[in-house]
C-alpha cells in the first residue's frame, strides 16, 4: 500500500463539512489534509521532503500516515455530527445512526459493522496484534451521543486539562465534574444491550453522570470495551500493570512512530511529559498549544500510540534488570542462553523476536539496540575486564577515521565487530563501566556527539570530557568539571547561590538520536524555605554543529518570598597549554597567551560581542572551546575569562528579567552555545566564523543590511579616510581655544591642506549655553543634556559651512547617556524621574539608589534611562538644531556603545526590571527619534563598536579596539571585522604628541588601522602641551604644531599614502571582510615606543599583513604593509582554504596590483598553498596582491 495514497484516500469529501464546531488546531489538520499528504506532514513538523525510503523508515512513515488517518476520521466525524445538529437532525439514538457514525471512528479502516483487525496494516506485524482494536460504541464514546448536556460539544466537551495517568486511557473528569462522555445503550449496535450495565445514565438534574455499578469509577467501565479486551488479549497481566503501562507510555520518547527511550537503570533515562513529544511537535509547528485541542482527540492519539508501543515497551522497559521471581527477563535470557558473536546477529535476533524488519528500523531504534547490545556484552565480560570501555563512533557516513577505542576493551571484542558497530549504529558515543557485574549499578554516561564535538557527562551531570572531531584522544578538560551552572536566588533572608551539578543527582534524559539531553533537579534549594526547580537542556544545533544549553527555573511556591537574580554557566578546567591562547571580545577582540584575567559587561566596549574561546596549542592538537551566548536581541549579561597555569575558565552570567521580583517561572531567553573548534594559532578566527554564522542568521542588528544598502551610510562618509578632532584629553583637560570656532576654522583649514585629502572633524567644546559670557560657558562634561546655543552663535554655523565647502565633514560632540544633576534640565524636568536606579540583590529589589558617575570636569552625573521618552526627545532636539539650523553633516553621540548598561529597577519605567534587552532597544529608539528630525542620510556615530547597535549607529570610534598591543601575550586580533566586515564603519585611535616625536609607533598605529579596515587618524589638534595641566598618564594630545613642522613631512606623506591606498581598496577594506592572517617569513621584528607616557607603548611589529575578501567572494587581496622607513623583505604564505573551505582543491590566479590600474600576474597556485616570495618593503609602503578564485 502506498502511504501517500493511504493518507489521500482518507480525506473524503470535506467540502460540504461545517467546520465551525472544530477548534483552530482541528481545522488546521483537516485543511492540511485537503492540500495533500505531504502538505499535512509539513504541518506536522516532519517537513515537506519526508519520504519512506530516505530520512524516515517505511515503518515510521506508515505510523505517521495511520496516526493522521485516525485523526482525520475523528475530525470528519465531529464536523459531520455538528452539521447534522445544525440541520435539526434527530438525536442519534437508533442503531442505524450509530452505525453511520461508527463508520467514522478512528480505527475503522474497513466495514464498520465488522470487527476491525490490523491484518492489512503493515505496522501490525508484532505477535498477536491481529485483534479487534475498536468497536463502534467506542467511537461514539469519543464523539458524544447527542443526548447529554455535553454532546453538542462533541470532542471538545471534556476538560482541556492535561492527561491524568491514573485515569483510564480515555477517561477523566469533564469541566462540569462529569465523567467521560459515553453513549447511552440505545446508541449501540444490536449487541449493545449485553453491555448495558457498563454504561452510565445521565442525571439531568445534576448535570452529572451516575455509575450503574456501585462506586466503580468510569475508568473501570472502560475495561469492558473492545479496546480493553484487546489489551487483555495482548497482555494477560494487563490489570496489574495498567497504571505502570500508562505512566510509562506518557514518559516515552517518541520519534517518528518508533520508541527508542529506555528505562532508568538500563540504558537511558526517562523524562516526564504529559503527552508524547510527537503531539507536542505536531501542534507546536502550526502554532497551536496542546490545551486548545479536544481532550478526547488527544487521548485517542495517545491510546493509539500506547498500543503500538506495547511490544517495544515489553522489549525495552526494565528488561536489563536482574531476573525477577517467576519470570526471566530478556537480559537474563540473553546472558544465559545466547552467545552473540556480533552486533549484527544481536540486532537480527531482536528483530526476529518482535517481527521487526531489520532494514526498516529507524536510526534511533538501531542506536537503542546498539546500546542494549553493549550493555549485554559488557555484563557478560565484566568479570574479565577492568577500567572503562569508551566507544567513540563517527557520523553515519563514517567521514572521520575509525578511531574507536580508548581505554580497556573486553578481551573478546573483535575488530570486525567494531566495524559492524560503526556501520549499524552511526553517530553514537557513550561510555560503559566494565568494573562491575551488578547490572543494577550500570549507569550509562550521557554523551552527546556531533561530527565536530563530543561532550561527556557522568552520572551526576558533571562534564568529564570534551573533545573534537580532529582527535577523540584529546580531552580539552583537565579535570572532571562539576558545579558548572549556578542559580542565584534572593529571599528575605539574603542571597544564595546554588551551583550544580553537585551532590544532588539530577533526573536525566537522553534523546533518541543521542545528541540532546536534559538534566532536571525538582528541588535545588534544600535547606532553604523556598522550593525551586531547575532544568538544563543541551540540544544539538545542526547548522552550527554545536551544543546549545537552555535553562529553566521553576518556583513551585510562587507565593513564597523568593526571587531569581542571575544564572551563570562557568566552564572551568579548560586546557590551555603554554603555546595555546584565549580570546576575549573587548574592542575588536583580544588574544591572550599565558595567565590573564578579563571581564566585560555586554553590550559595551569591554564586551562588544558575546563569545569567548580558549585552548589551542600542540597538546590540544590546535583545538579549543568556543563558548557564546547566541542572543540576537542583546540581553544584558556579563562575560568573564581567566587562565592560570595552563588552565582557563570561561563564564557567562545572565541577569534575569525582573531580577529580585516574585516569579513563577523563568526561562533563559537565548541559548548558551559551546563547541570544539580548530584553528591552531588562529583559534580565534575559527571561533569567530561560528559566531558569524549565528549573527548573520539570527541577530536583530543585521537586519539593516550591508553598508551599500543603508541610507545612513552615504558615499562621502564611507570614502572618508582621515579623522581629526579639535582637541581631546582623556582626563577632560582642555584649554580655552580648543573648541573656539575661529581657532577650529584656522587650524582645520591648514591641516586639510597639509594632508591634501578630505577628512572628518570631531568637534569638542563647541557648546556655549544660554549665557554668552566666556566664564559661564558650558565646558566639556558639564550641564548635559544642555548645549545650546553654540559658541559664537550663528558664527558657529558659518564655520561649519565654510569647512564643509573645503572638504571637511563636521561631527559635533554630544553625550547620549549621562544627566548632569546640576543642569537646568535636571532641575526643571524632574531629572531623577528619568534616570536609572540600581538595586542590590534583595527580594523585591527594594534597596535602590542612583548610579553616580564623575569625570575630570568634577560634575556629578546620573545615568539616564535610554527608553525614557523625555530623554529621547531632548537628545533629538539637540541633533535637530545642529543639523537643520547649523548645517553639520553628522553628529557624534558619546558613550552609547562604549559604556556598560546600568540595569534599571525604577518601578515606573517602561521596561523589564534589571535584566532584559531594553538597553539595546532604548538606544535604537534614541537614534530613531533623531532620524525623525534629520532624515535618514545623516551619519550618527558613537564610541566603540558594540554589535547590537550596528543597525542604528552609522559608525564607531574604535579607541578601545586599538588599545591593545598588536603582538605579544595580549594582542589585538581583528575578530570584529572578520565577523561584521562590510556591515560597519570603524574609525580612530588615540595618538599622542610623543608619537610624532618618535614616528615609528605612530606609523604602527596608522598601519594597524589600515590593515584592519578602519578609517585613519583621529589626530588631536588642540590640547595642553605644557605646564602643570599636562596629562602625564595618557600623554600630550595637542599635535597641531608637530603636524605642521617640516620634520613631519615624511610621516605626513606616509599617512596620506595609506589614506589614498585605503580608498583604492574600499571594495575590500570597507565592503568586504577580513580573513585569517597570512604568514610572514621571517617574522617581523618588534620594537617598543621610546616614550612610554602613552596608552599603547608596544610592542609593535615592523610590518603587518592581512587578507581581505571581496563582497562578491570572487577575489581577495593579500596586503603586506611596512611600518619602518627601512627596507624589509618577506616571503608570504597563505592558505585560503582555512578561511574559505569551498576553495578546497581549487587553483587561483595571483597578481600584484597597484592603484594606477597596472597589475602584474605572478602565477596560478593552489588555494591552500599560495606562496609569494621576496616581497620587499621600503619607505613605509605596502604591497598588494589580488587573488582571483575563477570559475
UniProtKB/Swiss-Prot annotation:
The GO terms describing molecular function are: hydrolase activity, acting on glycosyl bonds
Give the top-level enzyme category.
hydrolase
Q: Which UniProt keywords apply?
A: Glycosidase, Hydrolase
According to the UniProt entry, what is the EC number of this protein? Answer: 3.2.1.-
Q: Where is this region: Disordered?
A: 173-221
> Low complexity compositional bias: what residue ranges?
173-187
Keyword check for Iron? no
The domain of life for this entry's organism is Eukaryota
The record's similarity note reads: Belongs to the glycoside hydrolase-like 3 (GHL3) family.
Q: What is this protein called?
A: Putative glycoside hydrolase 22789
Amino acid at each position: 500500500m502506498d502511504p501517500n495514497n493511504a493518507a489521500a484516500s482518507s480525506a473524503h469529501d470535506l467540502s460540504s463539512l461545517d467546520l465551525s464546531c472544530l477548534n483552530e488546531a482541528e481545522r488546521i489538520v483537516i485543511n492540511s489534509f485537503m492540500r495533500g499528504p505531504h502538505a499535512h506532514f509539513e504541518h506536522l513538523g516532519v517537513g515537506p521532503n519526508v519520504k519512506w525510503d530516505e530520512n524516515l523508515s517505511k515503518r515510521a512513515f506508515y505510523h505517521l500516515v495511520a496516526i493522521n488517518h485516525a485523526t482525520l476520521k475523528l475530525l470528519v466525524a465531529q464536523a459531520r455530527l455538528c452539521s447534522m445538529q445544525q440541520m435539526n437532525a434527530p438525536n442519534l439514538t437508533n442503531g442505524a445512526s450509530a452505525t453511520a457514525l461508527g463508520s467514522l471512528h478512528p480505527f475503522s479502516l474497513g466495514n464498520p459493522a465488522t470487527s476491525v483487525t490490523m491484518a492489512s496494516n503493515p505496522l501490525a506485524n508484532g505477535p498477536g496484534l491481529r485483534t479487534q482494536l475498536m468497536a463502534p460504541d467506542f467511537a461514539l464514546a469519543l464523539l458524544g451521543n447527542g443526548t447529554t448536556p455535553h454532546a453538542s460539544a462533541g470532542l471538545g466537551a471534556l476538560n482541556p486539562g492535561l492527561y491524568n495517568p491514573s485515569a483510564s486511557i480515555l477517561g477523566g473528569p469533564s469541566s462540569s465534574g462529569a465523567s467521560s462522555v459515553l453513549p447511552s445503550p440505545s446508541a449501540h449496535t444490536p449487541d449493545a444491550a449485553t453491555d448495558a450495565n457498563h454504561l452510565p445514565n445521565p442525571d439531568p438534574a445534576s448535570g452529572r453522570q451516575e455509575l450503574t455499578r456501585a462506586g466503580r469509577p468510569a475508568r473501570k467501565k472502560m475495561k469492558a470495551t473492545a479496546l480493553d479486551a484487546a489489551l487483555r488479549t495482548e497482555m494477560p497481566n494487563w490489570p496489574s500493570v495498567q497504571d505502570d503501562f500508562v505512566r510509562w507510555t506518557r514518559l516515552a520518547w517518541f520519534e517518528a512512530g518508533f520508541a527508542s527511550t529506555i528505562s532508568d537503570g538500563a540504558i537511558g533515562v526517562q523524562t516526564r511529559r504529559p503527552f508524547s513529544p510527537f503531539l507536542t511537535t505536531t501542534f507546536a509547528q502550526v502554532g497551536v498549544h496542546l490545551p486548545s485541542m479536544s481532550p478526547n482527540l488527544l487521548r485517542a492519539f495517545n491510546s493509539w500510540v500506547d498500543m503500538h508501543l506495547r511490544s517495544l515497551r515489553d522489549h525495552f522497559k526494565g528488561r536489563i534488570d536482574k531476573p525477577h521471581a517467576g519470570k526471566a527477563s530478556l537480559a537474563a535470557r540473553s546472558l544465559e542462553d545466547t552467545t552473540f558473536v556480533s552486533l549484527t546477529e544481536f540486532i537480527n535476533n531482536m528483530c526476529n523476536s518482535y517481527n521487526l524488519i531489520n532494514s526498516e528500523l529507524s536510526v534511533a531504534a538501531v542506536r537503542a539496540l546498539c546500546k542494549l547490545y553493549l550493555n549485554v556484552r559488557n555484563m557478560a565480560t565484566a568479570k574479565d575486564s577492568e577500567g572503562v570501555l569508551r566507544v567513540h563512533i563517527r557520523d553515519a557516513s563514517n567521514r572521520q577515521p575509525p578511531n574507536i577505542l580508548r581505554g580497556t576493551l573486553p578481551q573478546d571484542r573483535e575488530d570486525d565487530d567494531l566495524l559492524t558497530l560503526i556501520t549499524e549504529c552511526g553517530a553514537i558515543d557513550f561510555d560503559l563501566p566494565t568494573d562491575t557485574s551488578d547490572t543494577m549499578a550500570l549507569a550509562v554516561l550521557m554523551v552527546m556527539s556531533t561530527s565536530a564535538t563530543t561532550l561527556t557527562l557522568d552520572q551526576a551531570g558533571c562534564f568529564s570530557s570534551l573533545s573534537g572531531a580532529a582527535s577523540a584522544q584529546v580531552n580539552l578538560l583537565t579535570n572532571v568539571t562539576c558545579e558548572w551552572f549556578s542559580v542565584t536566588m534572593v529571599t528575605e533572608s539574603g542571597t544564595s547561590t546554588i551551583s550544580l551539578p553537585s551532590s544532588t543527582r539530577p533526573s536525566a534524559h537522553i534523546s533518541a538520536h543521542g545528541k540532546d539531553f536534559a538534566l532536571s533537579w525538582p528541588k535545588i534549594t534544600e535547606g532553604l524555605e523556598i522550593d525551586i526547580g531547575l532544568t538544563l537542556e543541551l540540544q544539538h544545533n545542526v547548522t552550527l554543529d554545536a551544543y546549545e544549553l537552555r535553562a529553566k527555573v521553576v518556583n513551585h511556591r510562587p507565593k513564597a518570598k523568593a526571587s531569581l537574580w542571575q544564572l551563570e554557566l562557568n566552564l572551568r578546567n579548560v586546557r590551555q597549554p603554554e603555546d595555546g591562547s584565549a580570546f576575549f571580545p573587548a574592542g575588536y577582540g583580544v588574544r591572550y597567551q599565558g595567565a590573564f584575567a578579563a571581564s566585560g559587561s555586554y553590550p559595551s566596549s569591554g564586551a562588544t560581542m558575546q563569545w569567548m574561546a580558549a585552548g589551542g596549542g600542540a597538546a590540544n592538537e590546535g583545538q579549543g572551546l568556543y563558548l557564546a551566548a547566541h542572543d540576537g536581541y542583546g540581553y544584558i549579561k556579563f562575560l568573564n575569562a581567566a587562565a592560570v597555569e595552563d588552565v582557563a575558565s570561561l563564564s557567562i552570567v545572565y541577569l534575569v528579567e525582573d531580577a529580585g521580583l516574585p516569579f513563577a517561572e523563568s526561562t533563559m531567553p537565548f541559548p548558551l552555545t559551546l563547541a570544539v573548534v580548530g584553528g591552531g594559532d588562529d583559534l580565534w578566527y575559527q571561533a569567530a566564523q561560528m559566531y558569524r554564522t549565528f549573527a548573520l542568521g539570527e541577530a536583530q542588528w543585521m537586519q539593516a543590511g550591508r553598508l551599500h544598502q543603508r541610507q545612513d551610510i552615504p558615499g562621502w562618509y564611507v570614502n572618508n579616510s582621515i579623522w581629526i578632532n579639535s582637541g581631546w584629553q582623556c582626563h577632560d583637560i582642555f584649554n580655552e581655544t580648543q573648541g573656539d570656532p575661529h581657532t577650529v576654522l584656522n587650524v582645520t583649514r591648514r591641516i586639510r591642506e597639509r594632508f591634501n585629502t578630505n577628512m572628518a572633524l570631531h568637534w569638542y567644546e563647541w557648546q556655549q549655553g544660554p549665557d554668552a559670557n566666556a566664564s559661564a560657558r558650558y565646558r566639556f562634561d558639564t550641564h548635559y543634556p544642555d548645549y545650546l546655543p553654540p559658541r559664537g552663535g550663528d558664527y558657529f554655523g558659518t564655520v561649519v559651512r565654510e569647512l564643509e565647502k573645503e572638504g571637511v565633514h563636521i561631527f559635533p560632540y554630544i553625550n547620549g547617556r549621562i544627566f548632569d544633576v546640576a543642569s537646568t534640565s535636571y532641575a526643571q524636568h524632574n531629572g531623577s524621574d528619568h534616570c536609572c536606579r540600581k538595586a542590590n540583590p534583595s527580594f523585591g529589589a527594594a534597596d535602590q539608589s542612583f548610579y553616580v558617575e564623575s569625570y575630570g570636569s568634577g560634575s556629578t552625573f546620573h545615568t539616564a534611562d535610554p527608553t525614557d521618552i523625555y530623554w529621547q526627545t531632548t537628545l533629538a532636539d539637540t541633533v535637530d538644531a545642529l543639523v537643520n539650523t547649523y548645517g553639520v553633516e553628522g553628529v557624534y553621540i558619546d558613550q552609547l556603545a562604549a559604556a556598560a548598561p546600568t540595569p534599571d529597577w525604577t518601578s515606573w519605567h517602561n521596561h523589564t526590571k534589571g535584566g532584559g534587552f531594553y538597553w539595546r532597544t532604548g538606544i535604537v529608539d534614541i537614534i530613531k527619534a533623531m532620524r525623525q528630525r534629520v532624515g535618514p542620510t545623516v551619519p550618527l556615530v558613537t564610541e566603540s563598536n558594540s554589535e547590537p547597535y550596528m543597525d542604528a549607529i552609522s559608525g564607531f570610534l574604535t579607541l578601545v579596539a586599538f588599545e591593545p598591543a598588536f603582538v605579544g601575550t595580549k594582542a589585538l586580533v581583528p575578530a570584529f571585522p572578520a565577523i561584521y566586515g562590510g556591515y560597519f564603519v570603524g574609525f580612530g585611535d588615540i595618538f599622542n604628541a610623543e608619537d610624532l616625536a618618535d614616528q615609528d609607533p605612530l606609523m604602527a598605529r596608522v598601519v594597524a588601522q589600515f590593515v584592519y579596515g578602519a578609517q585613519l587618524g583621529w589626530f588631536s589638534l588642540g590640547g595642553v602641551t605644557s605646564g602643570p595641566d599636562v596629562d602625564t598618564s595618557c600623554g600630550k594630545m595637542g599635535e597641531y604644531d608637530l603636524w605642521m613642522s617640516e620634520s613631519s613631512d615624511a610621516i605626513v606623506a606616509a599617512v596620506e599614502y595609506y589614506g589614498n591606498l585605503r580608498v583604492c581598496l574600499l571594495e575590500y577594506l570597507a565592503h568586504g571582510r577580513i580573513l585569517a592572517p597570512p604568514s610572514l617569513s621571517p617574522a617581523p621584528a618588534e620594537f617598543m615606543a621610546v616614550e612610554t607616557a602613552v596608552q599603547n607603548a608596544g610592542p609593535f611589529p615592523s610590518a603587518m599583513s592581512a587578507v581581505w575578501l571581496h563582497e562578491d567572494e570572487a577575489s581577495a587581496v593579500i596586503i603586506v604593509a611596512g611600518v619602518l622607513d627601512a627596507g624589509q623583505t618577506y616571503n608570504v604564505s597563505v592558505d585560503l582554504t582555512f578561511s574559505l573551505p569551498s576553495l578546497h582543491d581549487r587553483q587561483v590566479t595571483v597578481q600584484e596590483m597597484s592603484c594606477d590600474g597596472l597589475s602584474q600576474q605572478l602565477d596560478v597556485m593552489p588555494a591552500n598553498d599560495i606562496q609569494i616570495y621576496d616581497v620587499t618593503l621600503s619607505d613605509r609602503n605596502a604591497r598588494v596582491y589580488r587573488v582571483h578564485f575563477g570559475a
